[in-house]
């Protein structure tokens, strides 16, 4: 029964295995595939015997493989044993070394402690070193800076970095105040003293270099270094003044040499030509000399201004003017000698007056550029001298025109001619005066010049005219003087600043007009038989003889027909129509006034004149109208 039951179970197990095998996906089972692949290497023929021996073969092969593993692991074990021995040896060595280290550590403990202490000290000293280096870098000059400040050699030139180092010296000196505030007075004072010495030495070197540079200036090559140097030297007024003096001395010599070269040699290559080539033309010669100075001296002033461009710590305008004055003073002697030579040699009054105006013009121009000094004094002296010379020449020329023909002493004109016109000498002197006054000038002092010139000519001319007319009859003298005065007045009236002189001449003319009017009126009174009648009027007598009135009225009617007939012949010789008309009008007014008195006396019923209309048939208004309309 049990066997019967076991068979189905056995079959089931077999069936399950078969099913399991059948259901297995051998293509995805790598281990099974590898096993089958290995089996194919020794199970080559599928026979019953081979299948029965398969198990034993597999076990045999398994034993062989295990033996190979065992042999291999034996070699590994031997190697591991050797490694273990080495490790044991190393452990022993390590223990030995550890023991030695412990021993050494115990022995060097103090050394290590000392080393650590020294290491900390070194770190502290390193910090101090860095602080000291920073302090020195801030408050001391480096070797390169020291060399820049004092120069590699005695005559080493100044370079731009010199001023940078000098600024650093001044900055260090200023920063020492911070040190003093922080309590480092001793160090600060020492550094300040050292920087002061550096600064003094640097400024002394800068002074020598600047002085030498100024001595060698030829073409005013003022560069930025010399400008900066002057700015730094301003802190030392004495050195600053010495440099300015040296510059002025050098430039004075250069200016004088260039002036002499311009006079004698001209420009480069002869262009422009030497100024002295025009010495025969005084106006151009003197004008060219002053034009050259007018160009050169302002250039010197511009260069001085450039030299002092950065000198803004104090007012140096006086020093600039003094230096410029000293430079310009060098040309005084050669200029004065040449101008005085021209003034002494020239005789033409107009040329002398032109030169005087040139001198005054350039004197005013130069005063705007350079004030004070010998040049200004020289120009003032030359201008005054030229004024005296041309006024003297003018006076001599006037005297030569007015000289007596007989050569006697004193001045006199030609005797007046019958026509009583001004003599030729008057016209000649007035034309000469006109030529002088026509010289164009816009300088200050023109009014004084014109006044002096006019006085130099007109005063002796007036005196001579009056002397020459002294022997003439009254009427002739009046006409002659009036004509001469009119000629002078009309000549001067066209010029400026002549108002006062013209007024004085007009006053003299008015005096002569009064004289001529009086003479003309007296002549009319005599010709019209007004003398007896006028005497009666003046005596306040009421009765006038009728016969006198008839004679007067007869002549009066003839006079009213032709008023000019009774005019003095000399009045017709008056050159000015206005003067002539004035004499005529004033004298006629006298007659009209007398006629009016007579008319009123005759027509007054109290005087008992019969038929006054027949005696005086014209009213005073009619008489005045007739005489004023002629």
Swiss-Prot record:
Major localisation: Golgi
UniProt-recorded name of the protein: Conserved oligomeric Golgi complex subunit 6
Assembly description: Component of the conserved oligomeric Golgi complex which is composed of eight different subunits and is required for normal Golgi morphology and localization.
Topology within the bilayer: Peripheral membrane protein
A Gene Ontology biological process term: intra-Golgi vesicle-mediated transport
GO cellular component: Golgi membrane; Golgi transport complex
Organism domain of life: Eukaryota
Record lineage: Eukaryota, Metazoa, Ecdysozoa, Arthropoda, Hexapoda
Gene: Cog6
Its job: Required for normal Golgi function.
Cellular compartments annotated: Golgi apparatus membrane
InterPro entries, sorted: COG6 (IPR010490), COG6_C (IPR048369), COG6_N (IPR048368)
Family: Belongs to the COG6 family.
Keywords: Golgi apparatus, Membrane, Protein transport, Transport
